[in-house]
Swiss-Prot record:
SMART domains: KH
NCBIfam families documented for this protein: rpsC_bact
GO CC terms in record: cytosolic small ribosomal subunit
Name of the featured protein: Small ribosomal subunit protein uS3
Organism this protein belongs to: Caldanaerobacter subterraneus subsp. tengcongensis (strain DSM 15242 / JCM 11007 / NBRC 100824 / MB4) (Thermoanaerobacter tengcongensis)
Matching HAMAP family: Ribosomal_uS3_B
Length: 221
């Protein structure tokens, strides 16, 4: 039942890296984990408009290094760096630790599954047809070099009485192949009929190199 598992769960340590890079003793682990969740939620809520698909947190003693991936880094940095300075001060006040922020630009947001899911959810909230939003996202991703993309929308689609799930896909999206670079994203659209869930899987190709064939000389035996 590999199709039921979060794509990152299978691939962490194989083709995906950890989003939290720190080690803690058993008694400290719960507090640090809760602090991580608070940091992620705060950054995501404050900078949602900048398009934040990924936040990587690295800890060392009394210092926290946070890598923020953004589709619109200018919105995070602000005029003359005021935005990022204000964010750093707020995070330091929240954690009582030294915070180092690193803003990384997402070059192709159309190939980021999380950003695609958030974009579709935003369009559904604006009463744009979910089918149109899904098909446009698929066309853009395939045009920019994706090997495959799958999108699923669940809920009371178009205000229907009975909730259902509709899926569209193009290309190849292998869920069992660990060497496949599968990006996964999830977002929710809040409509007058209730929440609509949007899931996106994007296949960016294979990561691990193919094994080289050994060529042996026939002579010299």
């Amino acid at each position: 039942m590999g199709q039921k598992v979060h794509p990152y769960g299978l691939r962490v340590g194989v083709t995906k890296d950890w989003l939290a890079k720190w080690y803690a003793k058993d008694k400290d682990f719960p507090n640090i984990l809760v602090e991580d969740i608070k940091i992620r939620n705060y950054i995501k809520e404050k900078l949602y408009a900048a398009g934040i698909p990924q936040i990587v947190i690295e800890r060392a003693s009394n210092r926290i290094k946070i890598d923020i991936y953004a589709a619109k880094p200018g919105m995070v940095i602000g005029k003359g760096g005021t935005g990022v300075d204000r964010l750093r001060e707020e995070l330091e006040k929240m954690t009582n630790k030294t915070v180092i922020l690193n803003i990384i630009e997402v070059k192709t947001p159309e190939l980021s599954a999380q950003l695609v899911a958030e974009n579709i959810a935003a369009q559904i909230e604006k009463r744009i047809s979910y089918r149109r939003a899904m098909k446009q996202a698929i066309a853009r991703a395939m045009k920019l070099g994706a090997k495959g993309i799958k999108i699923a929308c669940s809920g009371r689609l178009a205000g229907a009485e009975i909730a259902r799930t509709e899926r569209y896909h193009e290309g190849v999206v292998p869920l069992q192949t660990l060497r496949a670079d599968i990006d996964y994203g999830f977002a929710e659209a809040n409509t007058t009929y209730g929440k609509i869930g949007v899931k996106v899987w994007i296949n960016k190709g294979e990561i691990l190199p193919q094994p080289k064939k050994q060529v042996t000389a026939e002579g010299g035996k």
